[in-house]
Amino acid sequence: FDQGHGHAGGHKHHDPNEELELVHAWGHQHVSGVGLELRRESTGELLCATRPRYGNGSAAGNENGFVVGIPPCVWGPPPLAPPPRVRRGELMRTISRYNASEHHTGVMGIWILTAAPVKPSTAAHAGKERILV
């Protein structure tokens, strides 16, 4: 999981064991892409799978034969699926599938992920509050 950059372009040190919840996963592929998978490297667990949508017209945003959209995976409170938890330093695997019936160059697949630090459970802190009078 990319640890990103800190403020003012410098590097900020992060705890690789910090627990995060995934919020969004946006996949990116080029023409002839047929699907992307995001998997937890240590277990092979499938975290997100998506398939590109191809245009079938001539209008802008619906160009025939071109990838015009790839739906993201989105997690959160109900009715959304619960967010997968990952460690900041955890390795992820991208599987990017392409139709190879024709020659293509520049094929690739990447994910853009957003995540949020896991907040301590409110249940874990229940009864530990102090009231000052």
Across the structure, where does each feature detected by a protein language model lie?
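Beta-strand-centric surfaces of beta-sandwich/beta-rich domains
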Residues: F1-V133
